[in-house]
């Protein structure tokens, strides 16, 4: 891993996030039957067990509606999501995880728990708990956070 001692907070967080996502994606692709990109995982996490509109997903992942539609089309082809008309407004499309999508989502949650356990083994459970608490705090940046 690249030398990180000279990095500021923003870059440290970014490097760790990128590294963990890469490891998680590699582990999933070694174990899973369906190749799923980080972008697809990000969308699947936003969908979860709900049925948001495609516009809501687009706002949550902070990408254009066009890019969201393209990503969801790829996920449809893989059988990870299903799209349906909203009951009240047929112009509005809702997206949900399919049985396969939800199974992948659940298996990925287990994989992330394994990674967290490995991190705790390396740095200690107390430090992992402290890190999670710090990351969950209100950092006073509400005007830019989502």
How would you label these PLM feature ranges?
Residues 1-4, 125-146:
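C-terminal regulatory/oligomerization modules of transcriptional regulators
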Residues 1-34:
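N-terminal leader segment of winged-helix/HTH proteins
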Residues 5, 39-40, 100:
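N-terminal positioning helix adjacent to the helix-turn-helix/winged-helix DNA-binding module
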Residues 10-17, 61, 109, 120:
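Amphipathic, non-transmembrane alpha-helical scaffold segments
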Residues 19, 48-49, 114, 118:
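Alpha-helical structural segments
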Residues 22-66:
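N-terminal helix-turn-helix DNA-binding core of bacterial DNA-binding proteins
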Residues 26, 73-130, 136:
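Charged, amphipathic alpha-helical coiled-coil/dimerization segments
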């Amino acid at each position: 891993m690249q030398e990180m001692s000279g990095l500021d907070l923003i870059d440290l967080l970014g490097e760790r996030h990128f590294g963990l996502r890469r490891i998680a994606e590699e582990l999933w692709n070694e174990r899973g039957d369906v190749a799923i990109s980080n972008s697809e995982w990000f969308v699947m996490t936003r969908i979860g067990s709900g049925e948001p509109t495609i516009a809501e997903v687009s706002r949550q992942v902070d990408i254009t509606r066009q890019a969201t539609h393209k990503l969801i089309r790829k996920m449809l082809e893989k059988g990870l999501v299903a799209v349906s008309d909203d009951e009240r407004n047929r112009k509005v499309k809702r997206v949900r995880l399919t049985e396969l999508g939800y199974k992948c989502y659940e298996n990925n949650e287990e994989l992330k728990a394994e990674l967290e356990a490995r991190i705790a083994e390396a740095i200690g459970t107390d430090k992992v708990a402290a890190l999670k608490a710090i990351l969950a705090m209100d950092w006073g940046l509400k005007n830019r956070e989502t």
